[in-house]
């Protein structure tokens, strides 16, 4: 092996090592993201989803994770203004957790935004919202 080949090989190896290190550093400082699906009317499932979201925030730090709970189908009833989960939804949104209702489900169930909790957001389709988030690299959880 001549000296020129040795130097080129060393430079390539060093460059590859730096690229791997930079990727690892970026991955360790990247914000975590999780989307939770709730499509059941069961208050216990809602409590579990809200507990999961809160636990993730406590473990990773609220500023280091984006959390979105997407409700559709029978699960959307727990996002009504007078639902038994209303106080927990308020706490979650105040903690920075995004809670989203499916507008398709609202239309089928003849619900309007006036019927819903004031702090939630909306997506045209709950399933598509989850698909988009997964496509963006979000972790998916269905309690």
Regions found by a protein language model. Name each.
Residues 14-21:
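Hydrophobic h-region of N-terminal signal peptides that target proteins for export
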Residues 8, 22-143:
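Secreted/extracellular ectodomain signature
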Residues 1-13:
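N-terminal secretory signal peptides and thylakoid transit peptides that target proteins
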